[in-house]
Amino acid sequence: MMSLSVRPQRRLLSARVSRSQSFAGVLGSQERGPRNFTVFSPPGPQRKPLVLSRVSRMFSVAHPAPKVPQPERLDLVYAALKRGLTAYLEVHQQEQEKLQRQIKESKRNSRLGFLYDLDKQVKSIERFLRRLEFHASKIDELYEAYCVQRRLRDGAYNMVRAYSTGSPGSREARDSLAEATRGHREYTESMCLLENELEAQLGEFHLRMKGLAGFARLCVGDQYEICMKYGRQRWKLRGRIESSGKQVWDSEETVFLPLLTEFLSIKVTELKGLANHVVVGSVSCETKDLFAALPQVVAVDINDLGTIKLSLEVIWSPFDKDDQPSAASTVNKASTVTKRFSTYSQSPPDTPSLREQAFYNMLRRQEELENGTAWSLSSESSDDSSSPQLSGTARYSSTPKPLVQQPEPLPVQVTFRRPESLSSGSMDEEPPLTPALVNGHAPYSRTLSHISEASVDAALTEAMEAVDLKCPAPGPSPLVYPESTHVEHVSSVPPVADNGRSATSPALSTAGPAPTFIDPASSTQLDLVHKATDSGSSELPSITHTMASSTYSAVSPINSVPGLTSTTVGSTHKPMPSPLTSTGSIPSVTDSIQTTTSPTHTTPSPTHTTVSPTHSTPSPTHTTVSPSNAALSPSNATPSLSHSTTSPTQKATMSTHTTSAVGPVQTTTSPISTTVSPSPSVDTAIISSSSAVPSVPGPEARPCSHPTSTPYTKADPTAACTSSPSLASSGPKPLTSPAPDSLEQILKSPSSSPSSIVPEPQRSELSLALVAQAPVPEATGGAGDRRLEEALRTLMAALDDYRGQFPELQGLEQEVTRLESLLMQRQGLTRSRASSLSITVEHALESFSFLNDDEDEDNDSPGDRPTSSPEVVAEERLDSSNAQCLSTGCSALDATLVQHLYHCSCLLLKLGTFGPLRCQEAWALERLLREARVLQEVCEHSKLWGNAVTSAQEVVQFSASRPGFLTFWDQCTEGLNPFLCPVEQVLLTFCSQYGARLSLRQPGLAEAVCVKFLEDALGQKLPRRPHSGPGEQLTIFQFWSYVEVLDSPSMEAYVTETAEEVLLVQNLNSDDQAVVLKALRLAPEGRLRKDGLRALSSLLVHGNSKVMAAVSTQLRSLSLGPVFRERALLCFLDQLEDEDVQTRVAGCLALGCIKAPEGIEPLVYLCQTDTEAVREAARQSLQQCGEEGQSAHRQLEESLDALPCLFGPSSMASTAF
């Protein structure tokens, strides 16, 4: 039994029903009789039951084709579908081999009908397996075509944005823009059509109602209605609890067509009377986990507490009902042979008939084709009968003659986990992860026989996986080809698959436009190569021999080279010699092995062989893996290609070659070491950027100078890649340059290397703390200076997405364009917008470079393709590093602008909020207007960019006299550049200046006041614990823009007022009731700012009755003042958008206390969408908002039965009962 992952929706009502009878069972189909009602049938006389089938199909209306493609969702469904198809193949292959073994083990006294029945089932399963393989290949073709269209669409999007950002005026540019737009639309339509076609290949879900289960919830006479919605498909059924405790339902089964983008919505209603129904619960369930080979019994929690569960039996069929093969149910049903076995007589026949002899002759020929086992017509029984029988070898052996010498394999049980007997000693072995066979139906789970060794694929698989099995002594092991077709297939090395995970042979190193899907469970496979060498040196000879005997079972044309490159795995073990000999067309490799050594000890290891479902394929291109060279990022689980060293006499061929097969990598022979890590995670990029990009200037004064671009002259140009302008270290990820789906797209062409492409950031939700951690680049040229240019492109691309939606952003857009033009003029770049447009278009055209790679793959083989020369690669990197970057002439000012530009990009992500909750959006627009003023101030002083700045007064001036503030900033930046100041320095300066005076009021008050000042100025919460890497920094413009909007006339007045507010908040949060009540009585209206109002609202939730009454009275009295009421209204409405549930509850209760009619619409919205606690508080507040609020509450209650809930709590999960 398994539990279906639930995406719960909001409950319509909080119905509390207390009863005392538990669920007593589910009525079986035999006891229910032939009762069947049509879906959505009204109460009344029963309709005539269907004669042909009891299953009703719920897809009379076709599902509409999507208008917007969803590639991320399709990737998830495709991976689940592949796992399900692989499970189907494995289960039926095991069933087929079980039947074949029954045929081989049959005695001569078995009658013809028994063997004929077995053979008929084997043939039926073979046809079904061929059908499954064809179906899987068709799905793979659709997915590959979809991936091609996706990449073409991304490239067209880059072209459209490249042409639109430049605002070209020529006719040719307008025509090009129109053509790119038309191409983007066509690719989008193609993706939608392919999604629809792939959706048609998902098969069917057969759902069978098992019943409701609930402890102390179900009573005799209760009637329930269950409505399931899956896209446009519906299934509504009604049932009741009878006196015996059994359940009777008017509909038993249905069929749903799987959908890509829809979730299964289940709503359970208790029918109490005429138009008096109580909604028990409504949930949405994920259906991608239902692609399994065996039936599954799933349990879904209907209500919040899980006291009501819906039990369904789900059977997935990979084909439609109209096109269902006859052998689809052979595994799920009892074998026909088992049923008929008792009907056959066990007495031996006297004389075999001609029909029997022909049948045995057919079996003999088939056996000879498989493994050369001969049939004998000689009688070996005691009754001297002439009935044909198996020879002694085939008759008395439980398994056929093995192709690879190894003991009898252990049986494999189809369960959630692999058998524990498979150790982790092998190099190719996987960790104990969830296998492709996903099933949780206990009655159907059984022990299936192991895959027969008569198959070469099974033999090779066992040779690579069963490391703990005892292997024979090393020596030549001649192999027998079971079929002649295997040798013919080896010449064309196809992609291989292993356990449901796609892999690619090294012979196809430039494989296909479609990226290989990376299973989440396979992200740690590269570490297994290192762990495999630590399992003990005694296992290495056994592994080596097993791999050798299985590797040379086929001949590859690539092996025609005179030498054979050996594989070396860096390890701490001593070198273990492993002689590999082979007979046949492959020469001996004892004298021609080329050893590639690593900095650590070297251990020769066997050839890594990939196994395809139909034949074996040796891999002549071997892997060189070293713990000191091969790096794997632990956060993003993306293998990074490391140092590849060549010599005139020896070459090390590197390729990513694991069972997950992230992607084939082109052979690297350049002496220049390369480190490629596509799409790194934010945390990893930040940690690594501390060594690549210099940090804040030191205590000594550093004059601002023009940056000089110097080429990289280090022997290890890895820094050119690691310190390249990566926006992941301080801002959003690239948007225009989509991350390649495999490493081969990066290594294949130098034009797509990270050092030559300046990616443009994506709109991804990042915390503001990461933006504030942007380190200051030195004025030494190189990749660090490109951060300003990247930040400009990021913000301009984000502003293009919001163009025309918010008029407030027009000023910010003008200032960004003005800043870009001033920077270009300062660098002496006289290029026009059209010329810069051509460069942008040139970068966008690189999105289509994979089309040329596909043509090269069709024309040339991987072995014949020349690699890029080291001189060309070095020259291109020097050219890219020598490119002149945008800069103001001062590295500190550049870093300041970068921080502001990225802050603007993050603020833009808060715009476009759905629903009536718009406080965060209004706050973001206000901050963006302040950032526009900052950019305006910077642009107005562009003539002074190159001058040395020593004080804050040379940079900013307040509109009104505010003594003390600029002096305080100069004290903070003493010895530093005045543009930037670390927050730690601000805190130290503040405590040294005001700590003595504030500590008289309360110890630690100075730190609390300074932290509040920094958080308000930065617009984010500061971390309470120190962390590694560069800390947050406050710019002079953030300091200036925050002080401009303050009401305090001087620094001294601000410190005094803020200290009073901090003390008030601390008293309100005190655990002493007397302190809280005293603070409420003495709280003046002016000191209740945002933090004080939040503290008051929290008392409405966590305080006792006396404190809650005092808070309500205080809020009602203070809300009479218009200034306080406006401030409190904005604060409490902002709390409704907080992530914390208790904060939202407090905001709802506080809005009820001040009786704000402005909050009626947000409160109604929360009643429909939020959790139960928030909905209850919102209803209570609506009733306190006068007549208008009470009317809205009545309308809400009346519409609860008709309006479905929109969202659900993400913390809820279903449990199996």
Swiss-Prot record:
InterPro entries: ARM-like, ARM-type_fold, FAM65_N, RIPOR3. Residues 579-594, 650-661, 720-729 have a biased composition (Polar residues). GO terms for biological process: cellular response to starvation; establishment of Golgi localization; positive regulation of cell migration; positive regulation of intracellular protein transport; protein localization to Golgi apparatus; response to wounding; Rho protein signal transduction. The keyword NAD does not apply. Disulfide bonds: none annotated. Residues 371-413, 565-762, 850-874 are annotated as: Disordered. One of its GO terms (cellular component) is membrane. Keywords: Coiled coil, Cytoplasm, Golgi apparatus, Phosphoprotein. The modification Phosphothreonine is found at T351. It comes from the Eukaryota. One of its GO terms (molecular function) is 14-3-3 protein binding. It is found in: Cytoplasm; Golgi apparatus. Residues 376-391, 400-413, 595-649, 664-695 have a biased composition (Low complexity). The modification Phosphoserine is found at S22, S345, S347, S452, S455, S742, S868, S869. Residues 83-112, 786-828 form a coiled coil. Residues 852-861 have a biased composition (Acidic residues). Interacts (via N-terminus) with RHOA (GTP-bound form); this interaction links active RHOA to STK24 and STK26 kinases. Interacts with RHOB. Interacts with RHOC. Interacts (via C-terminus) with PDCD10; this interaction occurs in a Rho-independent manner. Interacts (via C-terminus) with STK24; this interaction occurs in a PDCD10-dependent and Rho-independent manner. Interacts (via C-terminus) with STK26; this interaction occurs in a PDCD10-dependent and Rho-independent manner. Interacts (via N-terminus) with 14-3-3 proteins; these interactions occur in a Rho-dependent manner. PANTHER family: PROTEIN KINASE PKN/PRK1, EFFECTOR, RHO FAMILY-INTERACTING CELL POLARIZATION REGULATOR 1. Downstream effector protein for Rho-type small GTPases that plays a role in cell polarity and directional migration. Acts as an adapter protein, linking active Rho proteins to STK24 and STK26 kinases, and hence positively regulates Golgi reorientation in polarized cell migration upon Rho activation. Involved in the subcellular relocation of STK26 from the Golgi to cytoplasm punctae in a Rho- and PDCD10-dependent manner upon serum stimulation. Belongs to the RIPOR family. This is Rho family-interacting cell polarization regulator 1. The lineage of its organism: Eukaryota, Metazoa, Chordata, Craniata, Vertebrata.
